């Protein structure tokens, strides 16, 4: 690993920053196998062209729930290989982007196995979502011991993840207790803003707090002093190689150029609206993958129980995409040439 157990918090505070993206997994349309070549192209595009700082691999966006254990490990392997390429665009730089691997599972043995695999192959961190606890009316002690146990079995830095799908949310106070675990370094806190703002105040020096909402990212930099967007798909669905406005407003906000950053952030509203208005309520995965295809990325198919878009839904999405204002090519350069 790149750090020792007792260095996990300091390492993450220094390097776990910027824009991270939750990687979707492209599946081939014929046999629904992982499209490894397509995934590699996507990762190179996200890092080299879009300037994404880190990748969240094999999470919910990546459809981990429909994958075998070997498939989840394979995604991790590919991500480490691509982010640690010896020469990215001729720069000679190594590990231009970091990785956080989802070891989330209801089976604790699987969590440990995936976390150990991530550690062995050189991933930077793992993320483990809070366990689903059936019939529980109180969960704090169970969750605390759950993460303490995982941390006792692996040395890699751990990010917590609390989201409504679990049937409950971790309180800011419980998260602050969890932040005392030496290798707990961050949390993806998919909760109302007042909850993650409170946790930021309670435990800022012990845990990096973030949430997946891109709509709130700018405000969280400016008002809460956040350093990390962890994370969802907007870093690669709102941007192209010649239209990196999320990267731009993030860097401006980090530099304290708040009003300039706000203007760039607001200019993306037509893109956000196009995505929201055309996304069928029951087909978020297929919609995102089709949007990726329109961007020239490998989107691919979804696995059951997820559903594909109809031709009418694709047509509506394409029309909105073409009108949203995202630039796909450098028109000024093309005209000059």
Placement of each model-derived feature along the sequence:
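Catalytic alpha/beta core domains of metabolic enzymes, predominantly
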Residues: 149-152, 164-272, 276-280
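Short, intrinsically disordered/low-complexity patches at protein termini
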Residues: 58-59, 134-135, 184, 283-287, ...
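Active-site beta->alpha loop and helix N-cap motifs at the rims of alpha/beta catalytic domains
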Residues: 2-167, 305-308, 331-334
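Repeat-unit-sized solenoid/scaffold elements
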Residues: 129-144, 188-204, 227-229, 292-298, ...
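General structural feature for long, well-ordered alpha-helical segments within catalytic domains
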Residues: 35-42, 71, 75, 110, ...
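Conserved, mostly hydrophobic/aromatic
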Residues: 31, 46, 79, 118, ...
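C-terminal alpha-helical cap/extension of soluble enzyme domains
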Residues: 2-9, 15-26, 49-52, 225-226, ...
């Amino acid at each position: 690993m790149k750090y020792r157990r007792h260095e996990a918090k300091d390492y993450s505070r220094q390097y776990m920053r910027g824009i991270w993206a939750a990687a979707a997994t492209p599946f081939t349309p014929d046999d629904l196998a992982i499209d490894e070549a397509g995934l590699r192209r996507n990762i190179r595009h996200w890092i080299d062209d879009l300037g994404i700082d880190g990748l969240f691999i094999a999470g919910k966006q990546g459809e981990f729930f429909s994958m075998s254990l070997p498939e989840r490990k394979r995604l991790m392997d590919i991500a480490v290989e691509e982010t640690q390429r010896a020469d990215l665009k001729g720069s000679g730089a190594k590990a231009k982007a970091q990785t956080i691997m989802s070891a989330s599972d209801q089976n604790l043995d699987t969590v440990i196995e995936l976390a150990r695999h991530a550690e062995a192959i050189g991933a930077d961190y793992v993320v483990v979502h809070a366990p689903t606890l059936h019939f529980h009316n109180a969960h704090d002690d169970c969750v605390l011991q759950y993460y303490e146990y995982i941390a006792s079995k692996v040395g890699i830095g751990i990010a917590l993840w609390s989201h409504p799908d679990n049937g409950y949310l971790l309180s800011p106070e419980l998260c602050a207790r969890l932040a005392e675990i030496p290798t707990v370094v961050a949390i993806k806190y998919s909760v109302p803003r007042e909850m993650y703002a409170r946790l930021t105040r309670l435990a800022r020096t012990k845990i990096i707090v973030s949430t997946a909402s891109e709509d709130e990212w700018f405000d969280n930099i400016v008002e809460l002093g956040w350093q990390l967007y962890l994370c969802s798909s907007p870093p690669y669905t709102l941007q192209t190689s010649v239209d990196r406005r999320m990267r731009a407003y993030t860097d401006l906000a980090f530099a304290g150029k708040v009003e300039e950053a706000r203007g760039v952030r607001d200019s993306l509203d037509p893109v956000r609206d196009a995505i929201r208005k055309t996304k069928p309520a029951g087909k978020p995965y297929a919609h995102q993958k089709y949007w990726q295809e329109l961007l020239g990325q490998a989107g691919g198919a979804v696995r059951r129980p997820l559903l594909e878009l109809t031709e009418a839904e694709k047509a509506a999405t394409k029309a909105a995409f073409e009108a949203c204002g995202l630039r796909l090519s450098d028109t000024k350069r093309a005209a000059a040439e």
